Amino acid sequence: MGKRIQLVLNQDVYKLGRNGDLVEVAPGYARNYLLPKAMAYVATPGVLKQAERRREQERQRQLELKQAAEKQKQVLEGVGTLTIAMPVGEKEALFGSVTAQDVADLIQSATGQEIDRRTLTLPEVRKLGTYTAEIKLHTEVTAAVKITVVAE
């Protein structure tokens, strides 16, 4: 196998790596594709230090986001069971259903914390009872909140 060149990627490159990754590629691939399209630049000692510093800053930022999500999880799970009143028909069947937006509004009124409805995972709620809503706060942090549906 011939000589290979070390490059730092400027952007995500399919089947090669992500932005900021240090990769080794064939000289022709670097010279004819990656470098002319500004997808990567040659890895000099200064560039390697800068890329490492950037990776460390990103790691620190992710750690701070995870810690903030852990705190938010403690607040949400410390609330206990939230109650929502819905109009009911025969056999305890609801008129309509409880939506993720309803739960997000309920959580905001109870805790003061704004929750995006797209982060909520809610089972289908069409009858009275207690349900568990899961809130994805971070890629590694999920909070569970109990919701009780009662007759209006």
From Swiss-Prot:
Keywords: Ribonucleoprotein, Ribosomal protein, RNA-binding, rRNA-binding. One of its GO terms (cellular component) is ribonucleoprotein complex. InterPro entries: Ribosomal_bL9, Ribosomal_bL9/RNase_H1_N, Ribosomal_bL9_bac/chp, Ribosomal_bL9_C, Ribosomal_bL9_C_sf, Ribosomal_bL9_N, Ribosomal_bL9_N_sf. One of its GO terms (molecular function) is structural constituent of ribosome. SUPFAM superfamilies: L9 N-domain-like (SSF55658), Ribosomal protein L9 C-domain (SSF55653). Binds to the 23S rRNA. Belongs to the bacterial ribosomal protein bL9 family. PANTHER family: 50S RIBOSOMAL PROTEIN L9 (PTHR21368). This is Large ribosomal subunit protein bL9.
